[in-house]
Amino acid sequence: MFFQLSGDFEARKILAQLSGLTPNDTTNKHSAKIIFGDERKPQKDFVYTDLSKTFPGYVYDFGKSTYRGETTGEGGYVYSEPGMYYNVAVLDVASMHPTSIEQLNLFGPYTKRFSDLKKARVLIKHGDVEAAGKILDLHIDETTNLKGLSDALKTVLNSVYGLTSAHFDNPFRDLRNKDNIVAKRGALFMIDLKHAVQDLGYQVVHIKTDSIKIPDATPEVIAFIMEFGRKYGYEFEHECTYEKMCLVNDAVYIAKKINGDKSVWESVGAQFAHPYVFKKMFSREKIE
């Protein structure tokens, strides 16, 4: 068990090194310390954005959000047109929620520190450890556990979004933020993107929070989506193109993609992911 969790413990120790707290302190305490320092009430400097000014027509009323004739939900936007499709481009927004926090300047003067953590993780991923060390004010050399450092930063970045929308009191919670504007900005953006792509004559068959799928995609529509995202501060990545995809509903699909010289099946949802079903019907792996 120790060896299985040793990587997590290494990340925990690096988290403590960044925050100055102990490895036994909670993730929430580490995150607050790293971003807000010793400020106990950072909320007084937070920025709350009325999204109806950025997205005219958006309404939040008695816990229900509507925009462009749709009920958006209070988390990520989900949309599907079940069916069988071919040549399906899959494009994902890189770090949607952290980017929304940056674009909203959610934490006011503390947003830069949050952005620095995000930048440092990208730099580590690309091997520029010297620049990452300068941003973090941390000495990094050949003995540094880079995976542990990256995991520690990921822990902070991932925990912060949940804390902004939590119903319990914490340093990241703004009482004005009733409509979860971090997730909502991404959702409203994806609705605008869906309409923009449809207006070009393409079909949008699936949207799941930060991902969009378009069948019979051309290089032109892929370039359009990437440029559309940049206008809102989002960077899209062309994750893959499915040779074919069977979409059952907004949470279940099976798809085949070309990976180098061979085809690879990818399943999402319990029905197709069941080992016997997946191996017997799709991957043709030996069933033991």
Task: Describe each PLM feature range.
Residues T27, D128-V129, N145, S283-K286:
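Alpha-helix capping and helix-coil boundary motifs
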Residues P42-H167:
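Catalytic nucleotidyl-transfer cores of nucleotide-processing enzymes
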Residues P215-E288:
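C-terminal polymerase-core module
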